[in-house]
């Protein structure tokens, strides 16, 4: 590694990379260094995996509080190391930690941060295409950041087709499961709806074992779309007729503790017709974000105990009250 960074420990290993915790000797800050493994001849370009090239290209162009920051790129012959903001945990660990109680204000804060980061991507014509809890990182100050842009793509070119084999199956929109090759921001919004549901249930809402089983699980809960509710459904490459195995029940049957304004938001994110599905901007304007309880402070978001930061003093607004994360609708 570069002499600027002092490696502290190995954090984990993925299919294409090893990740290390290191200290930036110039700033004194902790960083995460992703050391890219050499790709095979078929999947690599000039010895470097294409997903790494795509991630570098995208992250060098975008900067937002809710998107992981790429601080440095270190190249050496055919290896490459990406230096990122260090984050303490991810949303998957938070969801799975049974000692953590996620209050409505916590869920609203996480949802808003997700949408703000994703809205920034979509405004800049970028699809993430792999949103799921472990691709949402959190630091000890409660900042949520989107990460892992290996499947991300620019979109918007007329008649451009993409692969439908994107997004982890449990978070995959039905148009992808039906083989759509032309799609837009709706695939990311569908994933956000699945993540919100997982925050509420503490388990995946649609844990399909195959693409067909995934559709069955979706239709069992949301009902079956019709040509009237989803006009182009039957024209998709992999369309098959699927009948729900259970009687349709309203969302409040599955989320009995959720307020109606949150159910309305989720229903909009799970609209079958992607053209009618909510966008990030529309989602942020929903009644859910206008009503109490408002979002908690970022630093009040709970973390797994072993990563829990020391208690910090609460900040106060000028009038002596605690500030809250709210959107300005004026």
From Swiss-Prot:
The keyword Metal-binding does not apply. ATP binds at residues 11-19, 34. Keywords: ATP-binding, Cell cycle, Cell division, Kinase, Nucleotide-binding, Phosphoprotein, Serine/threonine-protein kinase, Transcription, Transcription regulation, Transferase. Residues 315-330 have a biased composition (Basic and acidic residues). Catalytic component which, in association with cyclin H (cyh-1) and mat1, is likely to form the CAK complex. It is an enzyme of class 2 (transferase). The lineage of its organism: Eukaryota, Metazoa, Ecdysozoa, Nematoda, Chromadorea. The keyword Kinase applies. Belongs to the protein kinase superfamily. CMGC Ser/Thr protein kinase family. CDC2/CDKX subfamily. The active site is at 130 (proton acceptor). GO terms for biological process: cell division; mitotic cell cycle, embryonic; mRNA transcription; positive regulation of transcription by RNA polymerase II; regulation of cell cycle. It comes from Caenorhabditis elegans. This is Cyclin-dependent kinase 7. The gene is cdk-7. GO terms for cellular component: cytoplasm; nucleus; transcription factor TFIIH holo complex; transcription factor TFIIK complex. Residues 5-289 form the Protein kinase domain. Disruption phenotype: RNAi-mediated knockdown results in an arrest at approximately 50-cell embryonic stage. The phenotype is more severe when done in a cdk7(ax224) mutant background where the embryonic arrest occurs at the 1-cell stage due to an arrest in early meiosis. Serine/threonine kinase involved in cell cycle control and in RNA polymerase II-mediated RNA transcription. Required for maintaining chromosome ploidy. May phosphorylate the large subunit of RNA polymerase II, ama-1. Residues 305-330 are annotated as: Disordered. It catalyses: L-seryl-[protein] + ATP = O-phospho-L-seryl-[protein] + ADP + H(+); L-threonyl-[protein] + ATP = O-phospho-L-threonyl-[protein] + ADP + H(+); [DNA-directed RNA polymerase] + ATP = phospho-[DNA-directed RNA polymerase] + ADP + H(+). Its EC number is 2.7.11.22, 2.7.11.23. The modification Phosphothreonine is found at residue 163. GO terms for molecular function: ATP binding; cyclin-dependent protein serine/threonine kinase activity; protein serine kinase activity; RNA polymerase II CTD heptapeptide repeat kinase activity.
